[in-house]
């Protein structure tokens, strides 16, 4: 049995410049009627920042147990795959063969139920989420429970958004949980001073008896693997439906379902809302560059702005800012 104090990091990465991968993706796009708003080319764009993700982890979270680096098979040419803390996982290593290849991030993340050696406690990162300052294990887990924010927020349907998928998540949550019981059993976890002004959301939504949605901060999520398995056992049909989708589809679920389950079960410890922040890259990413200098937030997520019209220029600015913050190579890089 693994040490319950161990915390793994899981990060998924796609090399959007890999010629063979792009060719396979293009072939399957012709075969499947994909939803372009959920599968735009910008979602696969390569920013060249992955080495700084590892530098940040080594500098700010040296206590991490293992890093599960999940890819289709490709590996950055600078990465030392023999590093003792690194576990390079190919899709074929844990995703059922019948569902491969997949270009669907939800399949890649929801299939973590099959990653046998993964610790009970892990933090799921996207490759656009970076540790921005020193963090402790207790920033992610406390008393063996995930740290998170229990903030209600109504689901707002928008074009080019994840709203349909989030709606599917919430249908399942309302199937198993009563908002009344949630608040009766864990009132202080939802009405907590650590949420700041976001407390108003929970107050304003009190008149509604059903759960209308949860606030998603778009930062790495702390998970207990047992919660993934519990939800899979109860709702394996929609898991399998999701697994069949080569590309993201409006009829599926994503890993936030497990997060909502943890929140609804009261299996979490409240965390300060200002722990992390989500930024969208724009043509002038001044706010992101300043944040890298000041480290106001422990975690930052840098979302690719689909409206960027000077990509190469902005990419250069971002790489320069990260290089200034993390100039020293990490031990994860080849010598």
Swiss-Prot record:
Record flagged with keyword Transferase: yes
Family: Belongs to the stealth family.
InterPro entries xrefs: Stealth, Stealth_CR1, Stealth_CR2
Molecular function via GO: transferase activity, transferring phosphorus-containing groups
Pfam family, one: Stealth_CR2
Name of the encoding gene: wcwK
Alphabetic keyword roster: Exopolysaccharide synthesis, Transferase
Entry's EC annotation: 2.7.-.-
Keyword match Mitochondrion: no
GO biological process, one term: polysaccharide biosynthetic process
Top-level EC class as recorded in UniProt: transferase
Other known facts: Stealth proteins are part of a protein family that is conserved from bacteria to higher eukaryotes. Family members were first identified in microbes as proteins that help pathogens to elude the host innate immune system. Microbial stealth proteins are involved in the biosynthesis of exopolysaccharides. Stealth proteins are predicted to function as hexose-1-phosphoryltransferases.
UniProt feature coiled coil, ranges: none
Protein name in the entry: Capsular polysaccharide phosphotransferase WcwK
Superkingdom as given in the UniProt entry: Bacteria
């Amino acid at each position: 049995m693994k040490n319950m104090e161990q915390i793994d990091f899981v990060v998924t990465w796609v090399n959007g410049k890999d010629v063979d991968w792009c060719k396979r993706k293009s072939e399957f796009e012709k075969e499947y009627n994909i939803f372009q708003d959920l599968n735009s080319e910008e979602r696969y764009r390569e920013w060249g920042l992955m080495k700084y993700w590892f530098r940040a982890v080594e500098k700010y979270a040296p206590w991490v147990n293992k890093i599960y680096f999940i890819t289709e098979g490709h590996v950055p040419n600078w990465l030392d795959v023999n590093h003792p803390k690194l576990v390079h996982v190919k899709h074929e290593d844990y995703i059922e063969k019948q569902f491969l290849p997949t270009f669907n991030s939800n399949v890649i993340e929801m299939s973590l139920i099959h990653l046998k050696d993964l610790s009970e406690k892990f933090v799921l990162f996207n490759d656009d989420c970076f540790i921005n300052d020193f963090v402790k294990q207790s920033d992610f887990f406390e008393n063996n429970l995930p740290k998170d924010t229990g903030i209600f927020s109504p689901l707002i349907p928008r074009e080019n958004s994840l709203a349909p998928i989030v709606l599917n998540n919430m249908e399942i949550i309302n199937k198993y949980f009563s908002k009344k019981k949630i608040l009766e059993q864990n009132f202080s976890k939802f009405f907590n001073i650590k949420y700041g002004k976001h407390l108003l959301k929970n107050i304003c939504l009190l008149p509604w008896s059903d759960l209308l949605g949860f606030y998603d901060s778009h930062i790495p999520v702390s998970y207990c693997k047992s919660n993934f398995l519990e939800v899979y056992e109860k709702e394996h049909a929609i898991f399998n439906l999701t697994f069949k989708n080569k590309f993201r589809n409006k009829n599926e679920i994503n890993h936030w379902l497990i997060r909502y389950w943890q929140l609804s079960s009261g299996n979490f410890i409240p965390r300060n809302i200002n722990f992390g922040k989500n930024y969208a890259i724009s043509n002038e990413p001044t706010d992101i560059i300043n944040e890298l200098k000041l480290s106001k937030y422990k975690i930052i997520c840098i979302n690719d702005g689909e409206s960027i019209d000077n990509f190469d220029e902005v990419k250069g600015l971002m790489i320069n800012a990260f290089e200034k913050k993390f100039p020293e190579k990490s031990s994860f890089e080849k010598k």
